[in-house]
Amino acid sequence: MSHAAKLSATSGRLLATAMSTKTSTETAALRHPVAKGWFVHSFTALGALCGMFGLMAVGDRNYKIAILWLAIAMVVDGLDGLAARKYEVKTHVPRIDGYTLDLIIDFVTCIVIPVMFMLRFFMLPHNPWGAIIASFVMLMSALWMSRTDQMTSDHFFNGFPCEWNMIVPTLFLLNMKPWPTAIACILLALTQLTNWKFLHPMQVRKFRPLTITVTVVWLATVLLMTADLPARNPIGEALLIACPLYIVGVGVWRTINGPTGGGDETAMPSTMHC
């Protein structure tokens, strides 16, 4: 074989190797975001485990562990949406619907477990009214979860967004009596089919740094006060009250003043779940 032929053959092999390497690299690059997408969905699915262990703790009458699992579920729920948007999971893993996945988990961790918690730890009246009120909360929450207009375009919720996983631990740690607890639950449930605005703790741009700070302080306070039970903590109790008042206050402000940041009242499904 002539020198030119050898050179040509060598060049061909090098080109083929380069093309093969490029193809492998491109394939790996394509697989990489898919792997990230599956990781995000798996992280979201951890909320189901939090729900299972939380429900077991309620059944065992272990309120400290139950609140801990609810808190962990809240952290997962707060982070998975950010990760899903960052890694574009809808594009890279379209066979899994993150909205449906989160909706299923939220129904357990945000509604079922908190309602069972109230019944198990006698937070509601001991007579049949307790079961009736719990049933009303479940019914209204199921209807809210099915709303097609859960959120406005500026990311405020229409009606109370089933955040019973925040309300119930707060009322429990405040040692609220059964009937005041029942009245608070009824009032919140009654708003669920209205267009009264409630603040999304992560997505509303207006006051976002303050909102995130208030939410983190509330969560830390819940964990610290739960660990210290049955001791009372007046400062902690004041912080527990401040967070719901802030959320309700911003909701009242938004309801009265209308959309923020160029948003409008256009209804859309909630993005709290994706």
Explain the meaning of each model-derived region.
Residues 30-86:
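Active-site-proximal cofactor/substrate-binding loop regions of enzyme domains
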Residues 2-27, 157-274:
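C-terminal membrane-associated helical module and adjoining short loops/tails
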Residues 43-49, 69-72, 76, 108-111, ...:
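Lipid-exposed faces of alpha-helical membrane segments in multi-pass integral membrane proteins
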Residues 32-42, 96-104, 150-158, 201-208:
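Short, amphipathic, aromatic/basic-enriched membrane-interface segments that mark the entry/exit
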Residues 40-45, 86-144:
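Multi-pass membrane catalytic core of lipid/isoprenoid biosynthesis enzymes
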Residues 35-36, 126-145, 199-206, 250-260:
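Hydrophobic alpha-helical transmembrane segments and immediately flanking/interface helices
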Residues 20-31, 79-98, 155-158, 162, ...:
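Cytosolic, membrane-interface loops and tails of multi-pass inner-membrane proteins
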Residues 53-68, 108, 114-133, 171-182, ...:
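Helix-coil boundary and interhelical linker segments in multi-pass alpha-helical membrane proteins
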